[in-house]
A protein has these predicted regions:
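Glycine- and aromatic-enriched membrane alpha-helices
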Residues: 1-456
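Positively charged, small/polar-rich N-terminal and surface patches that mediate targeting and assembly
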Residues: 401-405, 420-579
Length: 579
């Protein structure tokens, strides 16, 4: 007899865990560059869609098809008898719940190998993870395998999901090598910030929300007082550990870097969630507090270690979040377990080293298995399909070469975070933001004018000039209106990247100084003959002025010759009847 309450609760948990795919997609896309956004989204979609039939094919059978020490059984398409699981929910409900967990393990790998992985290779190794890697590890810990028989405890997947995915992420990033430009010739890291911190933050919020289904749903039951109490404790511990880890990461980066690091703090939230996942059912809130506290520091130190010492390029911090804190969360069970739901209490609760030893043994064996199998798979893929894309593909971006996608943001001007528009600050403020009150000196400082000397000898003087205006994107409409009011009827407009003497806004990304920042600008070019050049210059200066250095720059050139291609007309005549 099935329990409708437990069935509904398990399905809700499964749906929430599925929605974690959206969180991972946004998080990874935001923490990488815009030219690879489509590729990131495609990978997060396909690892789930590839993993689902693979897990149905043999994965679930290997994981739960029997109680053997090493594997469950070979049950293609899940047709066997699973009564030994003792479920009070329909088998297919349980299969759905386990399928979305399997997909999560594969998704973790995407982030660390982002921006340089061959898409074909990604599809192949995602299938391998869902077919043989995750199911066998899962059987050892959850399916009646040898680790579960020894008393190894991993309630919702710090080891089975996050550590497994994190180990593969570490191995893959190491075998791929760093992105072009990540390290200089001396091995010093260069920061490569993501292009959309807003998307990254939204992804973290989605993941945090879905984690209540990831951990809470793992109880598989809400039908008794005991299971309702357990689920409540699981959800509370999950939230507490994540919140504490976030606060600790913020404070730690504030002390370490001089300012609280946003991207690192977001990763701190995920680190706390990963770390509490193994023991959320067996630790007290005090234990959850300390687990989150350590996770908040560990994620920062881990990012710095892999970035600066190990030289493993992990664009989104997946290794530090999932591997480092998956290991920590699994070990923490052996330290903080109160003895409920585990074979032994943790070291700090009088249980001695028994539970801790089992947790450590399980981690070592699982990681060795994963590394050996995935190293072989990666090597085979590298020798056949190629694991990494060519340099020119990486430089141009995977979107255009791998998917024929010019931009994931059609219709929008999107630049990477290291190309973000510079905001006014005290170093550029000229003391007057009203153009009508600004002095000539302030106007010239905000929008300097560079005039090319007019050459008479040997140069035909047409009486025409080209005025080239470099301005902020936000000021284009005002500039266009000012030029139209003046009578300028033709202009050429292009988007450009560059920086002036300010060299962009100085910043750090995950503790690494960001190189010279290129800022998105608009370049407007007009050719004038009858209209006074000085009138054009003054109109542009008034339209662009905000009272800060960097408002824009104007270049004035002498035009020696203009030719209209269609008619052959030259100079002033060539400018008439503009097509």
């Amino acid at each position: 007899m099935f329990s409708s309450v437990n069935t509904c609760w398990t399905l809700v948990g499964a749906f929430l865990v599925y929605f974690m795919q959206a969180g991972f997609a946004l998080c990874e896309a935001g923490f990488t560059r815009a030219k690879n956004t489509g590729n990131i989204l495609m990978k997060n979609m396909m690892d789930f869609c590839i993993g689902t039939p693979c897990y149905w094919l043999i994965g679930f059978g290997l994981m739960f098809g029997g109680t053997g020490a090493l594997i469950g059984g070979f049950d293609s398409f899940i047709q066997g008898d699973y009564s030994h699981l003792g479920l009070d929910i329909p088998l297919w409900v349980y299969i759905v719940f386990q399928t979305v967990f399997c997909a999560t393990a594969a998704t973790i790998v995407s982030g660390s190998m982002a921006e340089r992985t061959n898409f074909k290779a990604y599809c192949v190794y995602s299938a391998a993870i869902s077919l043989v890697v995750y199911p066998i590890c899962g059987h050892w810990m959850w399916g009646g395998g040898w680790l579960q028989s020894m008393g190894f405890h991993d309630f919702a997947g710090s080891a089975a999901v996050h550590n497994v995915g994190g180990v593969i992420a570490l191995l893959g990033a190491w075998m791929l090598g760093p992105r072009i430009g990540k390290y200089d010739k001396d091995g010093n890291p260069h920061a490569i910030p993501g292009h959309n911190l807003t998307a990254g933050a939204l992804g973290v919020f989605i993941l945090w929300f879905c984690w209540f289904g990831f951990n809470g749903g793992s109880s598989l039951s809400l039908s008794t007082d005991a299971t309702m109490t357990l689920t409540g404790l699981v959800c509370f511990n999950t939230n507490l550990a994540a919140a504490v880890a976030t606060c600790v990461t913020m404070i730690f980066t504030w002390l370490r870097y001089g300012k609280p690091d946003v991207s690192m703090t977001l990763n701190g939230s995920l680190a706390g969630l990963v770390a509490i996942t193994a023991g959320c059912d067996t630790v007290s809130p005090f234990g959850a507090f300390f687990i989150g506290f350590v996770a908040g520091i560990l994620v920062v130190l881990s990012v710095e270690f892999f970035d600066k010492i190990a030289k493993v390029d992990d664009p989104v911090g997946a290794v530090s979040v999932h591997f480092a804190n998956g290991v920590w969360g699994t070990i923490a069970v052996g330290l903080f377990s109160t003895g409920s739901n585990t074979a032994h209490a943790g070291l700090f609760y009088g249980g001695g080293l028994a539970q801790l030893g089992t947790q450590l043994l399980g981690l070592v064996c699982v990681d060795v298995y994963v590394v050996v199998v995935m190293f072989i798979i990666f090597k085979i893929i590298d020798k056949t399909l190629g694991l990494r894309v060519p340099a020119e593909v990486e430089i141009d971006g995977l979107d255009i070469h791998e998917h024929g996608l010019a931009s994931a943001y059609a219709g929008f001007a999107i630049s990477d975070a290291n190309s973000a528009a510079m905001t006014p600050n005290e170093n550029t403020d000229l003391g007057e933001d009203d153009v009508t009150k600004a002095s000539a000196k302030q106007m010239d400082a905000a929008v300097p004018v560079v005039r090319e000397p007019v050459i008479h000898d040997g140069v035909y003087d047409t009486g025409m000039h080209k005025v080239s205006i470099i301005a902020k994107l936000a000021k284009f409409d005002q500039l266009k209106t000012a030029l139209n009011d003046l009578g300028v009827t033709g202009m050429t407009v292009t988007q450009v990247m560059g920086c002036g003497i300010q060299k962009g806004t100085p910043e750090k990304y995950r503790g690494v100084p960001v190189d010279t920042t290129l800022l998105p600008k608009i370049k407007v070019e007009v050719i004038v003959s009858r209209i006074s050049v000085d009138a054009v210059v003054e109109a542009a200066k008034k339209a662009l002025y905000t009272g800060h250095i960097g408002d824009g720059k104007i270049f004035v050139y002498n035009v020696t010759r203009v030719v209209k291609i269609r008619t052959g007309e030259e100079n002033y005549a060539a400018l008439q009847d503009v097509e």
